[in-house]
Regions:
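Short alpha-helical segments and helix-capping/turn motifs at coil-helix boundaries
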Residues: 48-49, 123
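Extended, charge-enriched "interface" segments that sit outside catalytic cores
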Residues: 1-46, 52
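Generic non-transmembrane alpha-helix signal with a bias for helix starts/N-cap capping motifs
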Residues: 47-48, 141
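Glycine-rich phosphate-binding loops that contact phosphosugars or nucleotide phosphates
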Residues: 55-161
């Protein structure tokens, strides 16, 4: 039988549970910015009105490299059945993306430094001024920040947690 050797008393280790609860209390007492970002009272560093113009968009292109889009891609893959929008993740230099250029996309360009070569190349190939573009980058002068200004696109400043 599969349940041989499994005893319910093994799941009732209150001492360890209380130890975990105490550790959690200590973490919550610290004013860690990442933990604070999960609270209902957290204030974003941007105006959420910026995001409203993307509500009507059906297709999104996320342009970035490595950690800049891996988390987003993981969340999308996990919730794919529930998400009603289409996402195309562009995280390398791929010739096949040129075929997708004709479709209408809203572009989310993500680069913490704003100087990642592959992101800049894909940005120059895939975006134009008539697209809906949203840049997520540090609040400093970088190539990506200057492109956002040139395209008159919205910029959300990347937080350094």
């Amino acid at each position: 039988m599969i349940t041989n050797g499994i005893y319910l008393k093994n799941f009732k280790l209150k001492r360890k549970s209380s130890k975990v609860a105490n550790i959690l209390k200590v973490i919550l007492k610290k004013k860690d910015p990442i933990i604070q970002s999960l609270s209902k009272n957290f204030k974003n560093s941007f105006d959420t009105k910026i995001l409203r113009k993307f509500n009507s968009s059906r297709n999104f292109r996320i342009i970035g490299m490595g950690g800049s889009i891996l988390g987003t891609e993981a969340i999308y893959n996990f919730l794919r059945d529930k998400v009603k929008k289409n996402f195309l993740f562009i995280n390398d230099l791929d010739v096949s993306i040129m075929n997708k250029k004709k479709e209408k996309y809203s572009n989310l360009i993500v680069s913490k430094s704003g100087e990642t070569i592959e992101t800049i190349v894909n940005l120059n190939i895939l975006t134009n001024k008539s697209d809906k573009n949203l840049f997520i980058t540090e609040n400093r002068k970088s190539y990506l920040y200057e492109m956002a200004e040139k395209l008159k696109a919205e910029v959300i400043h990347h937080n350094n947690f």
